[in-house]
């Protein structure tokens, strides 16, 4: 076998997973058909090598949690840096993860491990209007929509998937089934409608009761 042929075959083997992989480009909308940001789509599908869970990051900027919704795989460690020039006191009473990071600036020395699937509602004990969410899932493939309601998932094994959808404004904060999806090689496009009336209000504008209401919904959903 010539050196050129051996090199060509080696490159083909390395490229094969990406050549045979599927991609999903999805548009998430509310019940009025408007783009829905901060919505989670997750996929459970064929057995195969799942992407390695990357560390998560939930920042605090301008007295807001950024991003408003963070999706992570079960077992992910999440850091909570404070980029503001004032101190924050982050906490959650949600059944999926109870924790407290007392008044601090900068970045706490240890991240928080999210080892139970579910919705974790975040608040700040100093700034009552701050509200954020960590969506913890066992599904290996997931993404959060941007302000235009768009998501893209790449390097998916071709096959049949079960789709789950979630948004903070869903009734009882329970995930919504998105049906089944058959993905072949290449790019597929889908549109999903979630049963919510409007997109999430801009973080920082929520009334002071929002954390209590959101926590109660997450607690009830876990029961």
Please provide the spans of the model-predicted regions.
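Bacterial N-terminal signal peptides that target proteins for export
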Residues: 1-8
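Residue-level detector of alpha-helical transmembrane segments in integral membrane proteins
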Residues: 10-11, 30
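Small beta-barrel nucleic-acid-binding modules, principally OB-folds
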Residues: 13-14, 135
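N-terminal signal peptide c-region/cleavage motif recognized by signal peptidases
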Residues: 15-16, 21
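Extracytoplasmic copper-binding redox domains, predominantly the cupredoxin/blue-copper superfamily
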Residues: 21-223
């Amino acid at each position: 076998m010539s050196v050129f042929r051996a090199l060509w075959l080696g490159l083909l083997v390395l490229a094969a997973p990406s050549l045979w992989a599927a991609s999903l480009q999805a548009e998430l909308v509310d019940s009025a058909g408007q783009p829905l940001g901060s919505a989670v789509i997750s996929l459970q599908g064929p057995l195969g090598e799942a992407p390695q869970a990357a560390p998560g990051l939930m920042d605090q900027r301008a007295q807001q949690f950024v991003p408003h919704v963070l999706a992570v795989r079960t077992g992910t460690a999440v850091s909570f840096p404070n980029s503001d020039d004032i101190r924050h006191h982050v906490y959650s009473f949600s059944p999926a993860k109870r924790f407290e990071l007392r008044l601090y600036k900068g970045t706490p020395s240890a991240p928080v491990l999210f080892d139970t699937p579910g919705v974790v509602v975040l608040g700040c004990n100093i700034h009552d209007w701050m509200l954020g969410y960590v969506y913890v899932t066992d599904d290996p493939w997931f993404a959060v929509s941007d302000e235009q309601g768009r998501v893209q998932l790449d390097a998916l094994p071709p096959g049949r998937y079960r789709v789950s959808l979630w948004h903070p404004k869903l009734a009882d904060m329970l995930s919504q089934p998105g049906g089944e999806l058959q993905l072949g090689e290449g790019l597929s496009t889908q549109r999903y409608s979630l049963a919510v009336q409007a997109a999430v209000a801009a973080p920082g504008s929520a009334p002071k009761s929002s954390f209590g209401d959101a926590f109660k919904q997450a607690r009830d959903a876990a029961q």
